Amino acid sequence: YFGAAANEEREADWPEMKFFSSMDSPYPVAVNYRLLLPKILGDEVQKILYLDGDIICRGSIAELWQADLGSLLAAGVPDPLEAMHRRRLPEVKRYVNSGVLLMNLQLWRQENILGRAMECYQTMKDFGYPDQDVINRVCNGRIGLLPQSWNYPVSCNFAVQGRRNDIVPEARLCHFLGPVTKPWYVTCLDPRAQLWRSFRERSFWRDQPMSGAGSELEAEMRQIVRMFEDGQEAP
């Protein structure tokens, strides 16, 4: 839906796109597109399941889709680093990972969540994870909690963590977390990356070369630096 040319066209009509594009942030503007979903989609779309691009679906999501949000603005799975995030944002009751969000678009429109998110960006000084921090702050107290099977964390930075969690059978949505060693990098040596690669072999993009991201050691060193910057304790 979004591309470079499309972004320029929408910036002329949408002040929200211009706002997000003008932000001084190390993160790509695309991380904020989920906030625009109530505006992108017509009013007839009252609910949507948002998934990050680094997620693999391993079973039916009908049960998740049929969940009744009621007066909740969204539902998500607690972030693996929730304790660390709540130290930064003590006012947030629960902190969910924004990679899987069941969103109540009807209420997002009625309560102007997009506008409130933009205001939050203007007033917050410390952003660990911009869109995720904003969603958890603006929707504070009205985010339902989902079982971990709906956003099962898979970190390929196993040399940094010193441990590896096996992908359990009940995991429906597997999320390859972390900013560096992704399964589509040729330097990713984690055996669990084979799950993602097995799906790739069945896709239209199977003949496209995978990305190079420097050595795995370099990627893991960058992750260590980020852990200290975020105040995360070394494992």
Predicted regions and their residues:
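GT-A fold catalytic core of metal-dependent nucleotide-sugar glycosyltransferases
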Residues: 11, 30-81, 93-95, 102-106
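A short secondary-structure junction signal
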Residues: 48-53, 59-63, 85-89, 111-117, ...
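Short, charged, surface-exposed secondary-structure boundary motifs
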Residues: 19-20, 83-87, 155
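A general structural signal for short secondary-structure junctions and capping/turn motifs
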Residues: 39-41, 64-67, 90-93, 126-127, ...
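Short, solvent-exposed loop/turn segments at secondary-structure junctions
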Residues: 4, 13-16, 55-57, 80-82, ...
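A glycosyltransferase accessory/donor-loop signature
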Residues: 98, 103-235
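Active-site-proximal specificity loops/subdomain of glycosyltransferases
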Residues: 1-39
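Active-site rim elements
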Residues: 25, 86-92, 117-126
